[in-house]
């Protein structure tokens, strides 16, 4: 009986946390879509908000990728780190990215890194998802280079969200 009551209590807490996460995600997505600098006409979608919650940026990147069928990265403020020499603290942005089948996200980030070694602090991932940290003052450079990288790997292809549906279609449902 006591274990059951505890389980119910934990389930309620988890449900509250999940509802809160969904609200944060919705707000962040709406903010990202209303940003004047969000580019959905190019081959990428990159967004950053000072109030974005680091724990939800991956989900928002996934939603943007689904909406625009473009590799998408969302950034949030990262914890400021002290430099070893005691000078001014470094300001960083943490990002989470999601991609589409035609673009290998980690390779695109590697392209950015090779073009300018001073943009990203670190990055990692695979073809469809990646995490990265960039210097905050290099955000615009990152956006430009990421667009260049994805355009390079797209090789002139236009991204189209084609849905493949595997099902039987009865002959009497077809008309000419």
Indicate residue ranges for each PLM-predicted region.
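Hydrophobic helix-and-loop "lid/oligomerization" segment in the mid-to-C-terminal part
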Residues: 1-141, 148, 152, 159-174
